[in-house]
Amino acid sequence: MAFCALSFPAHISRATTPAPSDLQKSSSFSSRFYWGADLLRPSQYKVRKIQSGVYASLSESGEYHSRRPPTPLLDTINYPIHMKNLSVKELKQLSDELRSDVIFNVSNTGGHLGSSLGVVELTVALHFVFNTPQDRILWDVGHQSYPHKILTGRRDKMHTMRQTNGLAGFTKRSESEYDCFGTGHSSTTISAGLGMAVGRDLKGRKNNVVAVIGDGAMTAGQAYEAMNNAGYLDSDMIIILNDNKQVSLPTASLDGPIPPVGALSSALSRLQSNRPLRELREVAKGVTKQIGGSVHELAAKVDEYARGMISGSGSTLFEELGLYYIGPVDGHNIDDLVSILEEVKSTKTTGPVLIHCITEKGRGYPYAEKAADKYHGVAKFDPATGKQFKGTSNTQSYTTYFAEALVAEAEADKDVVAIHAAMGGGTGLNLFLRRFPTRCFDVGIAEQHAVTFAAGLACEGLKPFCAIYSSFMQRAYDQAIHDVDLQKLPVRFAMDRAGLVGADGPTHCGAFDVTFMACLPNMVVMAPSDEAELFHMVATAAAIDDRPSCFRYPRGNGIGVPLPQGNKGTPLEIGKGRVLVEGERVALLGYGTAVQSCLAAAALVEPHGLRLTVADARFCKPLDHALIRELAKNHEVLITVEEGSIGGFGSHVAQFMALDGLLDGKTKWRPIVLPDRYIDHGSPADQYVDAGLTPPHIAATVFNVLGQTREALKVMTT
């Protein structure tokens, strides 16, 4: 057994427990029972003093160790093929070393820690049993894929995780042939896996398809749509429900309390994967499709009997969807996982199988086990103490400012309510929840439901604020159109993480919200240029009660402008922008926080004898027509600047200018938008350079359009 080269304080260290013996094919059934044990037995950590330090415990001197742990077995594993001859005992050692490696790497890069630690044994078992990449393994969301990446040829690049030109934080098809499906958003893998399974069948292939889903993803309707279709199509595939108590149907509430019973549950699950019982059910299943009458009823009873024998939980939900259910299974028991996966792989059967694995988020790292929410996504941290190294700032995040503004509105108006889709921390609404517990609604990862739920609240005279990340708003677009905008219901959309988002990359980039929201006929579309403006736009949205509205704001902190007194914003005049700096020849019309880059660009240009006009549009819809006319008629060049895709704010300005005849004369218009491609993950600074949205890029555009190419080159190189 390998030991993690990390140490933890005595008050949270694990008790030493004997390691289970290797799986013996000849062992009796009764020998597999551990009466009274918990399904999630404590990790088998113990003090082991060796020459290079103390591992997995507090040292005698009270010192902690945070250097890279020794991983002699993992060092020999570059790809899954290298695991095939390992014994179960060695697989356990590999799991321990893999967990240590994940902790060490994430401590240096930041990233998703808890989810990855929770699937270490499952990852090892999957790659041991199945033959990837021929067999397909899909990781839903993908933030638990770090152990998978380490075992599939990318260990030497883990130090680049989520960094510019480094490994992605999720699975990515272009990164490795072992990443058969790209992820980042939740609840997609059963659908994609089913498509792969049906495609395999149509092509006459024999490979396996495994979809791993959980960690909140089972709260989304798509997962159930896919399971329903999988049961109907009856193609062979394996669905692994990674139940870490953050799914819609956790073990404790699936059909009432179902307490895990440790090795007893493991033994029952091993029995449940017994081939004769499975094949008995398949016979009955086939018969019921071909005959009727009394014989049909008999066959149905055989199927019911087999299913009852097999389903240890007593739940028929998954079976009613047409899935063959096995579980619950201890997701940290290599013996059981390997045995069950091999049985399922080798059994001649037809149709989808669901294996219900019970796992612990943050497994093997006490700090993450005790505070799963705080160690889901982490900054760089000290492995020995769990302390995260978060940057200091004199300002708060836009997310926090939004939450404070909404609390202020709710204090003044009892009809203000808040909705989020399993992102209470990410959207800041946990702050709202603490103040107004009966007026805040977490609907799970169910953005479609969140939007229509908000529409229903609006129908009853409430003032719903639906806080959803910009990229996740994409998942509820039909609801935004059909259930909200078409009916002119006053739902307020607070779209966080607008624009580039850094390490989370293109899956979470909020590039498209202005484009897809501003084309809706009844929608008011706004964006604040700073945190004070955000307070005013929250107040504006609260005051708009005859139609829907939305506002976007970025990841990151405010710029330090004075805030409204008492955190209470003042409603803005709808469709009115403002001029911040009066200049000549060239006007920069910024939208959202891009206004700050416009101001910085104006400062770069001024030493060259050119004073620019800088305006803050505030609204994309309705546009400030008077402001645009003024800027177009009094300047040679109008440049619109936004941190969004083609078809957004600039396109709406161009549409108006063209129809108003403002482009028929000498006035030139130039748009600066995100390029028509996905911006890869990296540091925010690198992403802005890649996108061409830095102040020097804006300044260079000014000089180029004026024909001053030398100045343009100079401003880009200084």
Swiss-Prot record:
GO terms for cellular component: chloroplast. Its cofactor is Mg(2+); thiamine diphosphate. Its EC number is 2.2.1.7. One of its GO terms (biological process) is 1-deoxy-D-xylulose 5-phosphate biosynthetic process. The keyword ATP-binding does not apply. Disulfide bonds: none annotated. Residues 1-55 form a transit peptide. It is found in: Plastid, Chloroplast. It holds the Pfam family DXP_synthase_N. InterPro entries: Dxylulose-5-P_synthase (IPR005477), THDP-binding (IPR029061), Transketo_C/PFOR_II (IPR009014), Transketolase-like_Pyr-bd (IPR005475), Transketolase_BS (IPR020826), Transketolase_C (IPR033248), Transketolase_CS (IPR049557). Thiamine diphosphate binds at H143, G184, H185, S186, G216, A217, N244, Y365, E447. Binds 1 Mg(2+) ion per subunit. GO terms for molecular function: 1-deoxy-D-xylulose-5-phosphate synthase activity; metal ion binding. Pathway: Metabolic intermediate biosynthesis; 1-deoxy-D-xylulose 5-phosphate biosynthesis; 1-deoxy-D-xylulose 5-phosphate from D-glyceraldehyde 3-phosphate and pyruvate: step 1/1. Transmembrane segments: none annotated. HAMAP family: DXP_synth. Homodimer. NCBIfam families: dxs, PRK05444.2-2. PANTHER family: 1-D-DEOXYXYLULOSE 5-PHOSPHATE SYNTHASE-RELATED, 1-DEOXY-D-XYLULOSE-5-PHOSPHATE SYNTHASE, CHLOROPLASTIC. Catalyzes the acyloin condensation reaction between C atoms 2 and 3 of pyruvate and glyceraldehyde 3-phosphate to yield 1-deoxy-D-xylulose-5-phosphate (DXP). This is 1-deoxy-D-xylulose-5-phosphate synthase 1, chloroplastic.
